[in-house]
Regions:
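"Short basic amphipathic alpha-helical interaction patches in structured regions
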Residues: 103-105, 121-130
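Short low-complexity stretches enriched in small and charged residues
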Residues: 63-70, 113-122
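Short, hydrophobic, well-ordered secondary-structure elements
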Residues: 78-119
């Protein structure tokens, strides 16, 4: 049996394998892949349970939003946010924290746009995140005291997630994700 990849051993291992053998190892890995080894820690299970509870509540919100036909364009964006959140949870469960954070960041951008476009459809073409958050400060859905608090919480979460995207060394976690592959 060939050992799993490690960063140190990758070059020597690659020298002994050809691409077909390597693909067979990857195919075997995919065939036998199981998430069960990721759910053995009770503390992690509680975190996943909390994440799922929030995700489920959001999915109920999106379903009701769509049912009421408030805004078809917003429906599409909120569906995309649902997808972003589910993918983020799936990545987090597997220990892939960076892609999980990146998906959350995408979800935040799409959520803010989905809400703003109810009254300001042209926000859909805006690519500047700064402009999107500025538009949120002026949007009636975020104009209430509660709405403004929510917008601020979302903005703070987005800022924290940006640390991962922009390579802040204080949030880097050298994971051995490659060691999970054949």
């Amino acid at each position: 049996s060939i050992p799993l990849y490690t960063l140190e051993g990758t070059k020597s291992l690659l020298n002994t394998l050809n691409i077909n053998d390597d693909f067979l190892l990857l195919e075997d890995f995919i065939t036998n892949y199981q998430l069960s080894k990721y759910n053995s820690d009770p503390e992690q299970i509680e975190k996943y349970k909390s994440m799922h509870k929030k995700l489920y509540a959001f999915l109920v919100f999106v379903a009701e939003f769509e049912r009421q036909s408030i805004n078809k364009n917003s429906d599409k964006f909120l569906s995309e946010v649902s997808s972003d959140l589910m993918l983020s949870l799936f990545c987090a469960i597997q220990g892939m924290y960076k892609p999980a954070k990146l998906q959350l960041r995408c979800g935040i951008e799409n959520f803010i746009k989905a809400i703003i476009m109810i009254d300001t459809p042209q926000i859909v073409v805006e690519t500047s995140v700064y402009a999107i958050f500025d538009a949120a400060t002026k949007d009636k859905h975020f104009a209430t005291v509660t709405g403004d608090k929510v917008r601020q919480k979302i903005r703070n979460a987005y800022t924290i997630l940006c640390h991962t995207v922009h390579g802040d060394t204080s949030v880097m976690h050298p994971l051995s994700a490659l060691s999970l592959l054949p």
